[in-house]
Amino acid sequence: MTRSLIDANVLLEILFARKLSDGCEQLLSDPSKEYAISALTLHIIWYMAERYKLSFENIIDMLSVLAILPITEQTIRLASQRYDNKDFEDCLQAACAETNNCQEIITIDKHFKQYSHTKLAVIVVG
């Protein structure tokens, strides 16, 4: 089974029902994959839900089918080594995926692979 890390922007696209939300939902419906998010993504979506007064029911429903991966000291050190003044969050997400045995990352960010310096497969929605 393929383990896929979902970048925060994919879940935000769904929660806010933005233009790519249907494509994101379709991509996340493959039963042959295990979907996961980083602890950082959980923080980001929870913060955005509070800020924009979104329903927490939707988040809780999402969390019931997603693994939540830890950000450890090893994750932070790996991300720090790769950071080149572009996007530390991308580096942290990629390092989290790599240290937790994910095979791919699903994102909306066209520059994710370039900024994160990951060797994992990166699937860009849209």
Regions inferred by a protein language model and the residue ranges of each:
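Acidic, PIN/NYN-like endoribonuclease modules and their adjacent C-terminal/linker elements
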Residues: 3, 95, 99-126
